[in-house]
């Protein structure tokens, strides 16, 4: 029923089977925070470790999931739906050796992901 929408409210997933990441996943605390903030207690049907596996189970119509916007989901038979009441961002950091020469490919990658070289 959700797939006909381009946007939904977070409340719309509360009564659906919810597929989420395991508690040791980097994204799980953010998902839990979003649900807690919205006072939503979904029925967790599965806790999985890999993005592709979460997407695969959603693609087999076994539940819904909150996932990061990643290209891997474009390869799966699922529809990404924007959740209207989520306005969260996650910051990622990249570590590298400071006092070394940076290759052209490295600098282009930094520019592509829009971050600063320190």
Please state what every model-predicted region is.
Residues 91, 95-118:
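Extended ligand-binding regions for polar small-molecule ligands
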Residues 11, 55-56, 107:
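Alpha-helical segments flanking ligand/cofactor-binding loops in enzyme cores
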Residues 41-53:
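Short beta-strand-to-loop elements that line the ligand-binding cleft
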Residues 5-6, 52-99:
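Beta-alpha-beta core module
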Residues 2-3, 17-38, 102-110:
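Secondary-structure junction motif
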Residues 4, 21-22, 44, 67-68:
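Thr-Gly-centered strand-to-loop micro-motif
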């Amino acid at each position: 029923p959700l797939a006909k929408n381009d946007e939904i409210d977070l409340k719309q997933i509360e009564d659906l089977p919810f597929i989420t990441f395991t508690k040791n996943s980097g994204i799980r605390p953010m998902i839990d925070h979003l649900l807690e903030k919205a006072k939503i207690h979904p029925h967790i049907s599965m806790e999985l470790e890999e993005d592709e596996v979460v997407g695969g189970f959603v693609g087999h119509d076994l539940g819904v999931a909150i996932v990061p916007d990643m290209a891997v989901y474009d390869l799966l038979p699922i529809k990404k739906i924007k959740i209207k009441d989520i306005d969260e961002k996650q910051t990622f950091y990249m570590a590298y050796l400071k006092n070394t020469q940076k290759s052209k490919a490295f600098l282009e990658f930094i520019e592509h992901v829009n971050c600063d070289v320190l």
